[in-house]
Amino acid sequence: MRKALGISRIYNILVYIFLYAPILVLIIFSFNDSKNRAVWSGFTLHWYVDLLHNDAIINAFIVTLGVSVLAALVATVFGTLAAIGFFSMRRKPRAFFMGVNNIPMTNADIITGVSLMLLFVFFTQILNDLVYFVGMQTGFWLPVDFHLGFITLLLAHITFDTPYVILSVLPCLRQLDKNLSEAAQDLGATPMQAFTKVVLPQLRPGIINGAIIAFTMSVDDFVISYFTAGADVSNLAMEVYSMARRHISPEINAISTILFTIVMILLIVINVRSIRQEQAEAKRLHALQRDASR
């Protein structure tokens, strides 16, 4: 028995080394004073300073931050409302829509990216044809040209972020006492007041977790962004890929370390919140059982 446990521990250690050793090497060599990726030449922050003077990286960071924040906010609103709608449905319709909701998460990113690209190209062509038709008929030409860019990138991120928000909010809805909203309305609250002051606070943990997950997914995305951003817009993941194709620069180690740190901080926040939520739920159930036994 002890031998089996020892082998299991060794196996787990080897798996973790295999998973995290490359990331650890990347982080260490992001502080290497030399461009040589095999020899340590001393500690430096030179490559991080160079990032601040790299206009392409700065622009990609601004695009990434803007898209991630906006997509997370919109997806959180849409996902929360959709989760409430799904929860209020009967069993069969809810199962159907939940299956549809899970498709973007189980589907290959390249298929989702190509599909969204074709959809956006189709609609941008229709809009450009409409602008041309209006200009020909009225003589008034709108100074617009619809094409793949920031808006299509944002719409794509909202599309794949929303299902994660829905799955984060639904567990909170299942734990919600259905009588709370009715009790609030019996005490004089309007349906909107009952929702905002009674129901919404109960859903807050799931909403916050969903927003953080959505933000993390947007920051980390490459494949879908690559197909939907167009030629004039680039996020950090796309910029790192472009830099890696030209030449392997230590700046790639630095920007990858920054991305990894951001994602890890958000994941730690999610895990801490989940643990606290589980502990609070366990305390609540324990209190109910104690009251019931009296």
Report the location of each language-model feature.
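Transmembrane-helix boundary motif in ABC transporter permease subunits
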Residues: 1-5, 70-101, 114, 118-121, ...
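Periplasmic/extracellular loop-to-transmembrane helix junction in inner-membrane transport proteins
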Residues: 4, 35-71, 245-246
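Membrane-interfacial helix termini and adjacent extracytoplasmic/periplasmic loops
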Residues: 36-41, 45-46, 50, 110-158, ...
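Hydrophobic alpha-helical transmembrane segments of multipass integral membrane proteins
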Residues: 58, 62, 66-78, 82, ...
